[in-house]
C-alpha cells in the first residue's frame, strides 16, 4: 500500500508514481481514500429485478448497472438448470453483450450452473431439468460462441461426467464441482480429469466427516481447486470461512455473490428461475421448503466481511479480484502498469465511492 499517482490512458494503467507530485491535468484527487482492483464475480444470477435467465439483453444490462455501484467491474452471467432450448437462448443473449461496453460492469462470459446435478443437493435448482452429462449437448452450448462459456458447474457422478470434464477442459472451460452428492474419491478422480473449481463451497455438496471427507474435504485438501465462497455470514459461518482459508490459503479462495434478482430490492416475494422465493432479513429462501435460494449479497459487503474476519486489505483484494483474474486469464485484478484500469475507490469504511471500468468512471456515490 502506498500513496502516489495512477496515470490511466486508453483504459489501461500506464504509469504508477509513488510520490506526492501535483495532479495531472484532468486528474482526480482521491486523498484519504483507498484505490483497489475492481471486484470480479464469477457467480451471479441477477440483481435489481433482473435475472440472467430472463433471456434478454436488458436484464443483463440491469445487472451490470447495479453491481458496478458495489464495486464489481467484471462478472460471469450465471445460468440455472433449465431446458436446453432455454439455456441456448440465454447464452445467445450473454454472447451479444460479452466484453461489450455497457453502462456498468463488463460481462466477460457465462457461468453454466447445471443442468448436470444431483437431486439430493439440488438447493434452489429445479430438479425436473437435472440429467446426466452429455458431450453432444455441451457442444451445442459451446458452439454458440467460442470463448463464451468460461465456467461450468456439474456433479462428477459417473463416467459420462468425467468425459464431460475432460472435453470441457480441452475446450478452455474451467470445470467446477457443485450441487453434488458424490464422495471424496469421486472428486479426486474428477480433479485428475481436469476439474479445478468448487461452486459455492460448503453449500449444495456432500459435507465433511472424519470417516467420509466428502466433496467439502476434497475441495479443502486439494491445491488444484479454486474454492468459491458466499461470504454473507448466512450461507457459511465466518469460522468455516476461516477454516477454508487456513486449509487452502488466500490464493485459492474466491468470494462470489450467487446473487439473485431481489438483490438491491426490498423484502418480498420474487422468482429464481421458475421457483418462488421470498426475501427477508437479507436472506433469500424458497417458498416451498425454506432452503436458501441464492443470496442478496454484493461484493463490497463480502470485501468488508473478509476484513472483519481479521484478514488484510491485500487478502480481501485477492479474494474479490486478483484470484479470479488469474484463474480466468483476465488482464485485471491488480494495480500494475499495463493492466486494465478496472478500479474501485473505497472510503475509510470500505464503502464504494467510485468505480472505473476500463478507465471510464461508471459510478460515483
Q: Predicted segment positions?
A:
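Active-site gating loops and adjacent loop-to-helix segments of metal-dependent hydrolytic enzymes
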Residues: 65-76, 119-146, 189-201, 212-226, ...
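Histidine-rich, glycine-flanked metal-binding segment
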Residues: 1-36
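Charged helix-capping and loop-helix junction motifs
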Residues: 56-59, 90-93, 134-136, 210-216
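Active-site core of metal-dependent hydrolases
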Residues: 139, 143-265
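Divalent metal-dependent hydrolysis catalytic cores, especially in the metallo-beta-lactamase
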Residues: 45, 61-90, 105-118, 145-157, ...
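Conserved, mostly hydrophobic/aromatic
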Residues: 32, 43, 67, 112, ...
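His/Asp/Glu-enriched, well-ordered alpha-helical/loop segment
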Residues: 217-229, 233, 245-257, 263-346
Amino acid at each position: 500500500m502506498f500513496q502516489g499517482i495512477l496515470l490511466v490512458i486508453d483504459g489501461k494503467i500506464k504509469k504508477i508514481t509513488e510520490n506526492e507530485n501535483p495532479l495531472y491535468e484532468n486528474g482526480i484527487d482521491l486523498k484519504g481514500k483507498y484505490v483497489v482492483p475492481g471486484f470480479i464475480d464469477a457467480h451471479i444470477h441477477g440483481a435489481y429485478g433482473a435475472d440472467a435467465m430472463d433471456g434478454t439483453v436488458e436484464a443483463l444490462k440491469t445487472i451490470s448497472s447495479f453491481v458496478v455501484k458495489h464495486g464489481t467491474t467484471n462478472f460471469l452471467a450465471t445460468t440455472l438448470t433449465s431446458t436446453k432450448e432455454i439455456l441456448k437462448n440465454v447464452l445467445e443473449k450473454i454472447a451479444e453483450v460479452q466484453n461489450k461496453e455497457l453502462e456498468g460492469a463488463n460481462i466477460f462470459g457465462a457461468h453454466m450452473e447445471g443442468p448436470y446435478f444431483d437431486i439430493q443437493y439440488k438447493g434452489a435448482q429445479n430438479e425436473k431439468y437435472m440429467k446426466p452429462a452429455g458431450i453432444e449437448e455441451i457442444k451445442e452450448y459451446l458452439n454458440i460462441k467460442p470463448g463464451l462459456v468460461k465456467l461450468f458447474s456439474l456433479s462428477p457422478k459417473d463416467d459420462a461426467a468425467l468425459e464431460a470434464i475432460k472435453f470441457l477442459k480441452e475446450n478452455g472451460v474451467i470445470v467446477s464441482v457443485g450441487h453434488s452428492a458424490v464422495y471424496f474419491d469421486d472428486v479426486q478422480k474428477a480433479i485428475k480429469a481436469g476439474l479445478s473449481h468448487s461452486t459455492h463451497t460448503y453449500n449444495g455438496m456432500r459435507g465433511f466427516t472424519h470417516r467420509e471427507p466428502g466433496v467439502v474435504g476434497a475441495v479443502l485438501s486439494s491445491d488444484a481447486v479454486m474454492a468459491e465462497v458466499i461470504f454473507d455470514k448466512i450461507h457459511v459461518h465466518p469460522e468455516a470461512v476461516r477454516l477454508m482459508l487456513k486449509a487452502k490459503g488466500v490464493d485459492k479462495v474466491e468470494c462470489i455473490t450467487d446473487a439473485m434478482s431481489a438483490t438491491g430490492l426490498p423484502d418480498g416475494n420474487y422468482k429464481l428461475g421458475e421457483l418462488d422465493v421470498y426475501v427477508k432479513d437479507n436472506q433469500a429462501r424458497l417458498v416451498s421448503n425454506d432452503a436458501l435460494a441464492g443470496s442478496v449479497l454484493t461484493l463490497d459487503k463480502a470485501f468488508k466481511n473478509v476484513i472483519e474476519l481479521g484478514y488484510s486489505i491485500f487478502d480481501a483484494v485477492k479474494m474479490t479480484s486478483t484470484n479470479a483474474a488469474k484463474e480466468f486469464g483476465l488482464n485485471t485484478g491488480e494495480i500494475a502498469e499495463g493492466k486494465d484500469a478496472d478500479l474501485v475507490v473505497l472510503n475509510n469504511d470500505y464503502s464504494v465511492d467510485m468505480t472505473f471500468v476500463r478507465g471510464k468512471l461508471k459510478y460515483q456515490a
